Amino acid sequence: GRTAHYIPELAKVNPNLFGISICDTNGNLFSIGDHNKPIAVESISKLFSLAFAIKKYGIKTVHNKIGMHGSFLPFNSILAAKLSPSLTINPFLNQGAMATTSLLYQKNLRKYKESLIKNMSNYASSSLRVGRMVYASESKTNDVNMSLAYLLKSADRFYAPVEPSVDAYTYQCSTMVTSDNLARMASVFANGGINPTNQKSLLSKKQTAYILNNLLPEGLYEYSDDWIARTGGRAYAKSGVGGGILIVIPGI
């Protein structure tokens, strides 16, 4: 692979960085390589905004407003949205992810954005921060996302003002994480919604199962089918163009 050149700041990332971290359901962390080097979380954040929305509104409401339709098209495809009866498709493609973030809208933009980072920090058992240079870079190159959001808004499938919501979505994607952070974040889902690092309950088992069942066919976009075939559907993965992959193996 190669770095994401359509976001200038991500194009500067060292492509030779490589780290692996594993956090088991007892909270034990094992790491090798560049496990303390921060990268932008990018689309992995979609998993956590979905969890946040489900925690706040419940499965039924989020399912009805966001949808869970599969797609063979790229994650930011306007055509994919147009071809879907509900337009949003699912929360793991950009249009559905931004619609999910719009459900979490607050009039105070600073508090709105900070709530998204705080939510991810709860899963990481660590105070995460936003990469300001990444955020600035992405904010200058998010025209497609803005177009998708306005398309959804025109069909009443976007639930807050477009510009602050897309800004908040860009902000959450610019959060910096290490592989250690990602491992601890994944461990919450592996442990049925309980953070094994501090024993805090973040999701119910039912909510966790719903999220994972819908992550499986879309977490790696058009490569998800190949992933399922290779893993037997036992590992749930979410990728991000920042270079990270989060993998959940329930019970381990």
Predicted segments, located by residue:
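Short, well-ordered beta-strand elements
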Residues: F30-I32, S102, G251-I252
